Regions:
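N-terminal secretory signal peptides and thylakoid transit peptides that target proteins
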Residues: 1-17
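PLP-dependent aminotransferase class I/II
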Residues: 62, 237-321
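PLP-dependent enzyme catalytic core of the Aspartate aminotransferase-like
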Residues: 342-346, 351, 355-400
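Conserved PLP-binding catalytic core of the aspartate aminotransferase-like
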Residues: 155, 302-303, 314-346, 366, ...
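N-terminal small-domain helix-loop-helix segment of the aminotransferase-like
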Residues: 26-110, 117
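PLP-dependent aminotransferase-like
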Residues: 121-179
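Active-site pre-lysine segment of PLP-dependent enzymes
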Residues: 163-171, 184-210, 214-247, 263
Length: 400
């Protein structure tokens, strides 16, 4: 199926239900990091920082992982292929976990490496990228740097990926990025909706690749949700990405992987950096994948703290999108920048701007219960009504 660049771009104009948001590139990603650094610089000296800005697991990895890391120091001088266990052992561990073949797996230095390589592998100047808005910015950032066309489809009224216009936009695309749960909105689509979406895209545009990113899979509590890994294994041009940065608490170790049919993910294998996972990360990942109890405990902990945080914000009149991650997308009724800076001045660092909702919404990661109780007190201080000169109550926040 041959689709020209002009044809791909024309589809954006002709789809009456599509809402296209200006693409965010590498410059925007760098600006996002600058926003986080700027907020942290406002934390007063001597105040213990509560960092709930980056969707990290506040407890870090479990004991089995820490023990595995400590045990690898004698092999720190070895390349990953010469260590025991090596990267092949990690691939085998993932294969065993999902009862699949090693050829169905590609390892990455975090799932971000895989996402970047997916844009390089599957998009071209003629066949662009389709993604949500807001959604994780990695893929559009790479596409913009490559000057490949991008269609960003605004989320629906429930802050979920808007599947109908995404299906229409996918015609002639090289890659569709389907973030499920979606970051930053934390919303999720059920298994049937995902399968229907993939089936429709396959019908409309058989050569288009669908990347289903399940970074927050382990936090989902919606009974309608299921991993798309079985779907990816039976369907050409579909693959799933996972990371150990979130529920496994290994954001600093940088381990991710892709799962799909061998012919689908082969281009990713060709693009990955040699020795892309360290000997420490390999050992840590193998230990983490074997520790199912730790993940169950982390899911339960996050669910309880998330419920507390939702209630605390709701009492302030701040509504959250239905969350199935370790973060919330919250309507604070004012620009995220103002809210972020006001919170930082009291020691709480929340998330960056997420266009097109940066004037009203903020992403708040879920910390420990103690952290979120303290953060809730700061939110009350920042968002509380203030008295006007005539004694009336104003809905404006107190930006202390």
């Amino acid at each position: 199926m041959s689709v020209s660049r002009r044809g791909f771009l024309r589809g954006r104009v002709l789809s009456c239900s599509e809402s296209v948001i200006a693409a965010r590139g590498m410059e925007a990603q760098q600006a996002d990091a600058a926003q986080d650094r700027s907020a942290r610089s406002l934390v007063p000296p001597g105040v213990t920082e509560i960092r709930i800005s980056s969707n990290e697991n506040p407890l870090g990895p479990g004991k089995a992982v820490l023990d595995a890391i400590l045990g690898k120091f004698p092999e720190a001088g070895r390349y990953p292929f010469n260590s025991t266990p090596n990267d092949g052992a990690l691939t085998s561990a993932i294969a065993s976990r999902f009862k699949i073949k090693p050829e169905n797996i590609v390892l990455g230095g975090g799932s971000q490496e895989i996402l970047k390589n997916a844009v390089r592998a599957y998009t071209t100047p003629a066949r662009g990228l389709v993604t949500g808005a807001p959604s994780f910015e990695n893929c559009p950032g790479v596409a913009k740097k490559l000057s490949h066309p991008i269609k960003e489809i605004k989320v629906d009224s429930l802050f979920r990926l808007d599947l109908e216009p995404m299906m229409d936009a996918a015609k002639g695309a090289g890659l569709v990025f389907f973030n499920n749960p979606n970051n930053p909105t934390a919303t999720v689509h059920g298994a049937q909706a995902v399968a229907d979406f993939v089936g429709r895209v396959r019908h409309l545009s058989p050569d288009t690749v669908v990347l289903i990113d399940e970074a927050y899979h382990d936090y989902v509590t919606d009974p309608a949700y299921e991993s798309a890994i079985p779907l990816a294994l039976e369907t050409p041009n579909v693959f799933v990405t996972r990371t150990l940065s979130k529920a496994y608490g290994m954001a600093g170790m940088r381990v991710g992987y892709a799962i799909g049919r061998a012919e689908t993910i082969k281009p990713l294998e060709k693009l990955k950096m040699p020795y892309n996972i360290s000997v420490f990360a390999i050992a840590a990942a193998i230990a983490a994948l074997s520790d199912a109890k730790h993940i169950e405990q982390e899911r339960d902990r996050n669910t309880k703290v998330r419920a507390f945080t939702i209630k605390a914000l709701d009492e302030l009149g701040c509504k959250s999108a239905v969350s199935h991650g370790n973060f919330l997308f919250v309507d604070v009724g004012r620009p995220a920048k103002q809210f972020r800076e006001a919170c930082a001045k009291q020691g709480v660092v929340v998330g960056r701007d997420f266009p097109p909702f940066e004037k009203t919404h903020v992403r708040i990661s879920i910390g420990t219960m103690d952290e979120m109780q303290k953060a809730a007190a700061v939110f009350r201080s920042v968002l509380r009504p203030v008295s006007t000169s005539d004694g009336a109550r104003s809905e404006e926040a107190s930006w202390r």
